[in-house]
Amino acid sequence: MAKETFYITTPIYYPSGNLHIGHAYSTVAGDVISRYKRMQGYDVRYLTGTDEHGQKIQEKAQKAGKTELEYLDEMISGIKSLWSKLEISNDDFIRTTEDRHKQVVEKVFERLLKQGDIYLGEYEGWYSVPDETYYTESQLVDPIYENGKIVGGKSPDSGHEVELVKEESYFFNINKYTDRLLEFYDANPDFIQPPSRKNEMINNFIKPGLEDLAVSRTSFDWGVRVPSNPKHVVYVWIDALVNYISALGYLSDDDELFQKYWPADVHLMAKEIVRFHSIIWPILLMALDLPLPKKVFAHGWILMKDGKMSKSKGNVVDPNVLIDRYGLDATRYYLMRELPFGSDGVFTPEAFVERTNYDLANDLGNLVNRTISMINKYFQGELPAYEGPKHELDEDMEALAHETVKHFNESMESFQFSVALSTVWKFISRTNKYIDETTPWVLAKDDSQKDMLGNVMAHLVENIRFAAVLLRPFLTHAPKEIFKQLNINEPELFELESLEQYGALKQPIMVTEKPTPIFPRLDTEAEIAYIKESMQPPKSEESKDEVEEPSKAQIDIKDFDKVEIKAATITDAENVPKSDKLLKIQIDLGLEQRQIVSGIAKFYRPEDIIGKKVAVVTNLKPAKLMGQKSEGMILSAEKDGVLTLVSLPSAIPNGAVIK
């Protein structure tokens, strides 16, 4: 009989720079689910990969003096190396530059075009021919006004004259599927997880009205070309999302994997891209008349004490550093235990070292070491089969073992990894306490208690086996080492099914003669300092003299009072179609929500600014930039042509006036 299938995916990562611990978080979570489902007997297919097209990749390659593929091959080598080091058990790795993917993107685009879901339109903006770039009115140098309107100006990059032009663009008519999408949500209430994300999608995006989506670009050429109109490159919305089916051979000569595994059981992603997976992707699949995935799960961010990870802040955590220094299991355990999946979590060196020392070295490691040492001391390493009386606590321990398995499975099914691990650690802690309560060292002094002592030892070994089996999806080395030191060699005893019966481990039990620590204790102060040092950006070899910009003319306090500046939180951001420099940003001002269009796209990716607390000029007259309404201006600092958002402490409430 064929096994039931389970198809799981991570987002495909954009290889414009080295991956950090946040990327590892998504991929380790997917690996934990995959391993758990395999232990349950599922035929699992686990997909991850890279999103390799777009202007940023083109610019990165040019800056490095390489072709796009040369640059990408180097970056992908590092990504695959990290996944290997993390022992990610993915079954496939999709690159959007592969022919198997590009051919599917071409076919999907042409099909949607033919059936009228994609149409050709125009986008209007200020264009510099030498720069091959569109600019917003606010970006123009020396703007020319007529009757209060800008009618011309110069490029901020080259100084060339700009002209108002219209550019062709293909648009995806997603609004026509709104009612059908809402009906799907109603019929599948668990489709978007956690539930708070569903409310956010409906209230913030669907109810206000979905705008047709620009799905092609002509301002760069690194991407999949539209077959029927090759001057257009397919934009990210279709290119990247299609990977989930192109990797299975959809629309190819061999679609066996697609027929077997689609629809996906779960798409994992960070919360900033849940909108694309819960709105655009379902609509795209509806247009293709394909089944929709069963679930999209948006996990939170790994934050630092001072906000999101940033090289400039010196708080980027490289997973390679943690693995090389502390081992794979300590790294995977921390990610899944400390950070509640579905919510934001804070990484601190202190918590990492504490989890390693207290949970892994003290609780688990010492339990294994103490048990093996006692069996060696009291039974010369071989625990015979005993038929004697049980200790009064033994039935409680057996019941707790089964209860632990039940709660563990419930938590794993809902992807509550930290809760699942907490359940196991409560069991481990109770087992440690069981040693203190049964006092084996006292029983060993009385020959008449030998059978009782044997039963206590047998319960300790069985409890350790239960814990090791449950930890297999999370820890790839420690369970194997535990089984080895306990001399448990039967493969069936490593599986979840073996936990249905307490005492499945048959005696006699022969343990290793000299137990070795599974998790050595860390020097707390030294290792905290080491992690903090590894997070600092490399110091430049030479410090450049800073030249201050000349100040502008002085103003009166009355002039300054005319400007209203308030604190706001960025709740969403996305690129403005056909613009290389603009982001469309949604902000929360406390009593109202606003949209602002800001020229920071060259310095920030949309997902990097969501959640930031910023300063906003709120009494500017509304303007339209590239067809998008803008109701204010987010303050930023400029140095050497680089813009940096002015960030505010999170304690300042939204809407607070800044004076």
Swiss-Prot record:
GO cellular component: cytoplasm
Motif ('HIGH' region): 13-23
Every tRNA-binding domain range: 559-659
Catalytic activity: tRNA(Met) + L-methionine + ATP = L-methionyl-tRNA(Met) + AMP + diphosphate
PROSITE patterns: AA_TRNA_LIGASE_I, TRBD
Placement of sequence motif 'KMSKS' region: 308-312
GO BP annotations, alphabetical order: methionyl-tRNA aminoacylation
Keyword RNA-binding: yes
PANTHER family: METHIONINE--TRNA LIGASE, MITOCHONDRIAL, METHIONYL-TRNA SYNTHETASE
Family membership noted in the UniProt record: Belongs to the class-I aminoacyl-tRNA synthetase family. MetG type 2B subfamily.
Subunit note: Homodimer.
This protein's name: Methionine--tRNA ligase
Source organism (scientific name): Staphylococcus haemolyticus (strain JCSC1435)
Lineage, opening ranks: Bacteria, Bacillati, Bacillota, Bacilli, Bacillales
